[in-house]
Amino acid sequence: MELSSEDNLRLNVLLRNQPLAIRIDESSMVLYGLSEKGEAKVQLNPTCRDDQYLRIVRELLSGHVLGSPGGYPVYLQRWTRMGQTRDENLEQLLLLGEPEAVIAVACATGLTDELARRAWWTAQDPDNARRMLRNPAVVKGAMGPELAQFLIEYLPFETEPEVIVESLRL
């Protein structure tokens, strides 16, 4: 199994243009790249089952970004939620199209306001917003009010009391 030639070309062009972050909409099979100029969109054309094809796409991204052809390294998945990722790799993690990599960035102690903006573009998730708001640099930056506003608007949809209290505390 391999990428279609069209997808391979488009993804390599996207990566050559040095995107700031990448996200994948798995339901519509679209890959988005964030750049200084805006957003690029690549409609994926699977040559096999969608889940297998997405794995191949992520392997290409990982091979280009980290030099790891097997996809997002398993050992990093264990470290991410503990904030044990190295700060110099945070920008690279946002190029993998992996939800767990975005969590790694959101949990990192070296998270900056700009990296928080990119991570938020990649995965607008209330848990990620709470993770990022634990970082003083994000709270003081431009993303702090945006994330806080999102959590306030999302409060009616929360069902867990602990999560509601945590959102209000932040």
Functional labels for PLM-detected ranges:
Residues 1-170:
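Alpha-helical scaffold segments
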